[in-house]
């Protein structure tokens, strides 16, 4: 009887062991199937295995299968239940320690529903929570990495890119006078050259900023700077005006991505207490770019001897050398940028934990070695990564031909950029975007509007002063003479010239009124702003002159001959003094920004971004009223320097605030949109203020003051980001 009872007990125990093992293996197989499906959906290869414990420990500690009998006998788990599939991962790379992204989101027996069963609102809510946790953790990690050699190296690399943007703004204004004559640009088309660059920069800022949030800061910056450098070099060699316009358009399109990408990139490797100051120091490179362009223009463009020609079809003048020299900062930044890593904050945002961890370790080790502490260990093991939400569909390889796949890829990327841009108007950044839009537009409109108004007013004052020095010659007669010198700023009225020779004469701002030329010869004559009004020419020979029909107004010709008229466009001697003056004024105006840059960098983290932004814009608006007293060139130049020095603090603080208000997933996109709006406001300001130069001072002064003060008051309503971590 006792033996029979023992047999039944052993049989029950064996049956329970078998049932337990069957259930365990069933649950294991279900979880493995879900794991594979999850891996295929999320494209993870190993992260789910990082904190996965042994399969035999499926039941939590202290929890046993109901009805289980405790025994000391060897279980079948010691020799059975070994799954050969587990051997696939033995000895393989298990990844750098990261957050629990393994089975937390996997649907399994008795666990919460997985991501595929959640609606988008729930997923976005979880992602926001993850981003808040990541922001706090990332700030601590950056503080542990310290501020040192890595940040300074990146500072100079990104500074070269920002310098290239500053150069691009000045290049067209400096080469325009020379390019107009060299490329035969008509007066009606000269304005296109200045506007086309801003148009390219406007489109480029939006596109490259959006792309930086998709493919990364480094990748986007490399591409956009390469585009700028290539077409900037190409523009120095093209001959036709149309090709030159296209090259400058594409060059502007490339450089448009520099500002939004550079500031987003650099801000993401700076700790909170360093961010405001060092972003302000970075702004100084834009000023250096302006100084570099002014100095190079001053040194190169007036040297007409620095030119060569290959027949009459190809002309390479000094202004083309200047264009090449101005492309050097861009090329330097591209070369240096290839040695820098991607932004670790961006990599964490897109779920690339391991790459971000290695870059953060690189930053830490680089700074520690520079401090003489190479033994210090990077203690971070796990970094939170936000939940990834699929938005776009991956293109399959069988999508038609290669060009169709390329077209679909471009369209998909553009659609993704547009979706990111629309999210800039979603909660919680919608109100900030609207306020930033107002501040960016008003500051750009007032700054660039007055920037073009100042030189035009100075030029207008120069013209008035030049007119006062005009020499008037009236009712005189010259016979049997020969002239071979330059005639400048003269008006000849009622004159009579007989049997005279004008040999190699350069006429500059000379007007002949009611005059008679008898048996005269004009040989190898060049003229600028020279006209013959109501004049009579008798038996006169014109040989190798540039006298176009429009220079003869109501004039009469009797038995006259025109031989070998000069064709094409030559670099003229016009405005040699004015060219130097333009370079000098721009040089001083750009140099005046230096004190404002230093002050803003030192006080950015002390008095706050908003105080500096609002105060600088209000003071700039008030300073406009001093223009009432600008009655001379020197006074206007002084006002220009004062105005530039005050507004630079507003620009620096606005850049810092914009970077800090947007979260990482839309930071470059939002910055790019606002920078594109800045360029549109600049074009509008140039048109409006440029049309008011010769009318009155009152309208430009009141308009600029009102716009700047209103923008400054709106800027004071923005959130203070001085104590916030970078989201």
Swiss-Prot record:
Which residues get modified to Phosphotyrosine? 466
Give the Extracellular compartment stretches of this protein: 176-191, 248, 302-320, 459-578, 631-636, 694-697
Residues annotated as carrying Phosphoserine in the record are: 75-76
Q: Tell me the residues on which Phosphothreonine occurs.
A: 79
Q: Does the keyword Magnesium apply?
A: no
Basic and acidic residues bias locations:
113-128
Q: Name one GO molecular function term.
A: transmembrane transporter activity
Which stretches does the entry tag as region Interaction with SYT1?
A: 1-57
Q: Which residues cross the membrane?
A: 155-175, 192-212, 227-247, 249-269, 281-301, 321-341, 438-458, 579-599, 610-630, 637-657, 671-693, 698-716
What is the reported tissue distribution?
A: Expressed in specific subsets of conventional synapses in the retina (at protein level). Expressed in diaphragm motor nerve terminals (at protein level). Expressed in a subset of hippocampus neurons (at protein level).
What kind of modification does the protein receive after translation? N-glycosylated.
Keywords of this entry? Cytoplasmic vesicle, Glycoprotein, Membrane, Neurotransmitter transport, Phosphoprotein, Receptor, Synapse, Transmembrane, Transmembrane helix, Transport
What is its induction behaviour?
Answer: Up-regulated upon Sv2a depletion.
| Subunit structure comment from the entry | Interacts with SYT1 in a calcium-dependent manner. (Microbial infection) Interacts with C.botulinum neurotoxin type A (BoNT/A, botA).
What function is annotated for this protein?
Plays a role in the control of regulated secretion in neural and endocrine cells, enhancing selectively low-frequency neurotransmission. Positively regulates vesicle fusion by maintaining the readily releasable pool of secretory vesicles. (Microbial infection) Receptor for C.botulinum neurotoxin type A (BoNT/A, botA); the toxin binds Sv2c via extracellular loop 4.
What is this protein's name? Synaptic vesicle glycoprotein 2C
Identify the species of origin: Mus musculus (Mouse)
Q: Which gene encodes it?
A: Sv2c
């Amino acid at each position: 009887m006792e033996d029979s009872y023992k047999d039944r007990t052993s049989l029950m125990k064996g049956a329970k062991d078998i049932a337990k093992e069957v259930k365990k293996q069933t649950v294991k197989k279900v979880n493995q199937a879900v794991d594979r499906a999850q891996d295929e959906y999320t494209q993870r290869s190993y992260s789910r295995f990082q904190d996965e414990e042994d399969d035999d420990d499926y039941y939590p500690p202290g929890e046993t299968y109901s009805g289980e009998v405790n025994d000391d006998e060897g279980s079948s788990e010691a020799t059975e239940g070994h799954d050969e599939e587990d051997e696939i991962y033995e000895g393989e790379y298990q990844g750098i320690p990261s957050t629990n992204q393994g089975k937390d989101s996997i649907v399994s027996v008795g666990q919460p529903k997985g991501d595929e069963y959640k609606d988008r609102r729930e997923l976005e809510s979880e992602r926001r929570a993850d981003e808040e946790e990541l922001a706090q953790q990332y700030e601590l990690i950056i503080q542990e990495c310290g501020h040192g050699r890595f940040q300074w190296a990146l500072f100079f690399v990104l500074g070269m890119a920002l310098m290239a943007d500053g150069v691009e703004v000045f290049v067209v204004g400096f080469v325009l006078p020379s390019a107009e004559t060299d490329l035969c640009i008509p007066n009606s088309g000269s304005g296109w050259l200045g506007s086309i660059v801003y148009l390219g920069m406007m489109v480029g800022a939006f596109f490259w900023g959006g792309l930086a949030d998709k493919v990364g800061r480094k990748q986007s910056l490399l591409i956009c700077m390469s585009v700028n450098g290539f077409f900037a070099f190409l523009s120095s060699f093209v001959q036709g005006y149309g090709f030159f316009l296209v090259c400058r358009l594409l060059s502007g399109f490339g450089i448009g991505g520099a500002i939004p990408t550079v500031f987003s990139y650099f801000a993401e490797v700076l700790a909170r207490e360093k961010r405001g100051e060092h972003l302000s120091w970075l702004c100084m490179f834009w000023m250096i770019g302006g100084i570099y362009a002014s100095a190079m223009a001053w040194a190169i463009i007036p040297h007409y001897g620095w030119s060569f020609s290959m027949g009459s079809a190809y002309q390479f003048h000094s202004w083309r050398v200047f264009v090449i020299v101005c492309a050097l900062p861009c090329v330097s930044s591209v070369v240096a940028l290839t040695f820098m890593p991607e932004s670790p904050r961006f990599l964490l945002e897109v779920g690339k934990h391991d790459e971000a961890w290695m870059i953060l370790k690189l930053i830490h080790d680089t700074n520690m070695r520079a401090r003489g502490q190479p033994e210090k260990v990077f203690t971070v093991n796990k970094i939170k990564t936000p939940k990834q939400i699929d938005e776009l569909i991956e293109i399959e390889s069988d999508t038609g031909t290669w060009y169709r796949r390329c077209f679909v890829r471009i369209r998909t990327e553009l659609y993704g950029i547009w979706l990111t841009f629309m999210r800039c108007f979603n909660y919680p950044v919608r109100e900030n975007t609207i306020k930033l839009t107002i501040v960016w537009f008003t500051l750009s409109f007032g700054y660039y509007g007055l920037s073009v108004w100042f030189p035009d007013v100075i030029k207008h004052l120069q013209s008035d002063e030049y007119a006062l020095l005009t020499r008037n010659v009236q009712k005189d007669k010259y016979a049997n003479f020969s002239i071979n010198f330059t005639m400048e700023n003269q008006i000849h009225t009622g004159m009579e010239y007989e049997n005279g020779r004008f040999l190699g004469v350069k006429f500059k701002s000379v007007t002949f009124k009611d005059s008679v030329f008898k048996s005269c010869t004009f040989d190898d004559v060049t003229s600028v702003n020279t006209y013959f009004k109501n004049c009579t020419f008798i038996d006169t020979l014109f040989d190798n002159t540039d006298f176009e029909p429009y220079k003869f107004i109501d004039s009469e010709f009797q038995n006259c001959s025109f031989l070998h008229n000069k064709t094409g466009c030559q670099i003229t001697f016009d405005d040699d003094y004015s060219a130097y003056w333009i370079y000098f004024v721009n040089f001083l105006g750009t140099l005046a920004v230096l004190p404002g840059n230093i002050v803003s960098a030192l006080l950015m983290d002390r008095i706050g971004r908003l105080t500096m932004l609002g105060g600088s814009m209000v003071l700039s608006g008030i300073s406009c009223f001093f223009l009432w007293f600008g009655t001379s060139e020197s006074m206007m130049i002084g006002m220009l320097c004062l105005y530039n020095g005050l507004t630079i603090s507003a620009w620096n603080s606005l850049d810092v605030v914009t970077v800090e208000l947007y979260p990482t997933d839309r930071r470059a996109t939002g910055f790019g949109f606002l920078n594109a709006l800045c360029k549109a406001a600049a074009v509008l300001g140039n048109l409006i203020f440029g049309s008011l130069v010769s009318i009155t001072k009152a309208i430009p002064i009141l308009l600029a003051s009102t716009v700047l003060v209103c923008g400054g008051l709106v800027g004071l309503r923005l959130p203070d980001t001085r104590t916030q971590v970078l989201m």
